[in-house]
């Protein structure tokens, strides 16, 4: 049975530990939060399985384009989710909400995801989409408490949501769904090879 857990560090940072089977399922759901780890330069691979897993990293773009509808739905869904959280007093956000009326980080994510969606559907590589073109603006949104007032934050967030709804609908109306079966094969074969090697090593103990 796949098992995953979350470790909470003394700094309150969260580290997700995922069973590789569940991780591959997350890749297929096309969520940016999981796919982006395929593109980072900072990672450690268990040397025992590195050669097998390298095929996954070599096919990062193909995996990130496994299902175009799932990708668009996930990116748009993140915008809607961040809008819902913008002024909501979640326990982890309540200090910011009480002080400023909204969470700047959520607004930052809304802007970032809208730009990502536009670039993704225009055909840019996933690797490029992960790097915002308006980094300085996003830094100001995220870090400067007086950069955007509460009233303007709500207005801008709502406008972004409406644009994203339109972009998503136009895409679904005019672009056919594409599912890359070769990615299914790659992920399944990689899982098989990793588990096979793991079992062989266990039997040798």
Language-model regions, residue ranges each:
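Metal-dependent nucleotidyltransferase catalytic core
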Residues: 1-45
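Conserved nucleotidyltransferase catalytic core and NTase-mimicking acidic/glycine-rich helix/loop elements
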Residues: 52-193
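Residues in flexible loops and secondary-structure boundaries
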Residues: 35, 129, 202-203
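Intrinsically disordered, low-complexity terminal tails
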Residues: 188, 192-205
